[in-house]
Amino acid sequence: MKLLAATVLLLTICSLEGALVRRQAKEPCVESLVSQYFQTVTDYGKDLMEKVKSPELQAEAKSYFEKSKEQLTPLIKKAGTELVNFLSYFVELGTQPATQ
């Protein structure tokens, strides 16, 4: 009986010490996590800026924008003329009853 009581007492003390150690363990601080996140973002930004500075990437971007401009210019002109026609239709519609 004494052996059983001693065993239970020993197990209880060990589990309490384990809980105490867990409570005393340093948890990761929110500030350090945020700081680490911003440091990672800053590093990625620096890497991206180095990649953007390469002349071949700049030439590729320039050709892409020129190609896009060539394709979009006729569409924008067409949309502009259709908008003017649409608005002039309503202007004419509004002036017709006044003249009759």
Swiss-Prot record:
Keyword Secreted (UniProt): yes
Q: For this UniProt entry, what is the primary localization, expressed as one broad class?
A: secreted
- The signal peptide stretch is 1-18
A GO cellular-component term linked to this record: early endosome
Report the function annotation for this chain: May stabilize HDL (high density lipoprotein) structure by its association with lipids, and affect the HDL metabolism.
**Subunit composition and interactions:** Monomer. Homodimer; disulfide-linked. Also forms a disulfide-linked heterodimer with APOD. Interacts with NAXE and NDRG1. (Microbial infection) Interacts with HCV core protein.
Task: List the protein's name.
Answer: Apolipoprotein A-II
Q: What is the lineage of its organism?
A: Eukaryota, Metazoa, Chordata, Craniata, Vertebrata
Gene name, Swiss-Prot/TrEMBL? APOA2
